[in-house]
């Protein structure tokens, strides 16, 4: 449900369940994306006013937050005034940023404290639009990356890895390197196995180690081009040790689960674990490191 999650000086403002894409591996259900809730005006105002004064990081997410752009844009203006030192991360598919009337209103609000995280699912329109089930979405998301070039914002691209795009992961990374001046960070993301991802797991799931090994050439290529690369949602035992510096503790603490076998692992404290849903579906066999390793 839409709402506000406060964790010390970190806030997540979840503004809507609805989305204008229909990604096959979305961790939300189709029903929530198509018939879910926007906040009403009273709820929105109440949650916005509940953001604490000492906040250092604000994440705005959905669904697709720019489906609520008429409320979101004034909120961003107020956030800029009230929390000038807070970093703002906006998780968006970017499609609305290809619309001139929205982008023209958004651009004056963007400061160097902003970061936009936009998913790109493949190196071309055919694959990306197949995954989003939304014709034209690739063109719109790429347009968003170009539009953000003229702003002081940082730009992050997220690639969610699965069987449908596994063979084109390196091509996707190469494409993003051609947009180097527009991209600061690329994060390769392992799926959260809930919602549509869980329902479609038989033809989506790919083992963590296979995903890492397949993408490694493209990852190294991106790093050589000066782009920061991160690995999200990967247990350390599934990642080649040479890529460990890229692994992020990215899973919300309430969603993390460790296998019983992880208790004996010498690297447990350094590992971000796996999603509870992944463990529940028995999709990963962990490989604990011995105390002497």
Predicted regions and their residues:
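Canonical Radical SAM [4Fe-4S] cluster-binding loop centered on the CxxxCxxC motif
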Residues: 2-43, 268-274
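Canonical radical SAM enzyme core domain
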Residues: 33-46, 65-110, 120-126, 134-140, ...
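Conserved C-terminal portion of the radical SAM core fold
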Residues: 54-60, 83, 89, 114-115, ...
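Short Fe-S-cluster ligation motifs
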Residues: 46-66, 286-293
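Flexible mid-to-C-terminal extensions adjoining Fe-S/redox cofactors in radical SAM and related proteins
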Residues: 240-293
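Short glycine-enriched, charge-decorated loop/helix-capping segments at active-site entrances
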Residues: 29-35, 130-136, 201-207
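Short, electropositive alpha-helical surface patch
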Residues: 73-80, 116, 166-184, 240-256
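N-terminal [4Fe-4S]-dependent radical SAM core
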Residues: 1-12, 53-54, 242-250
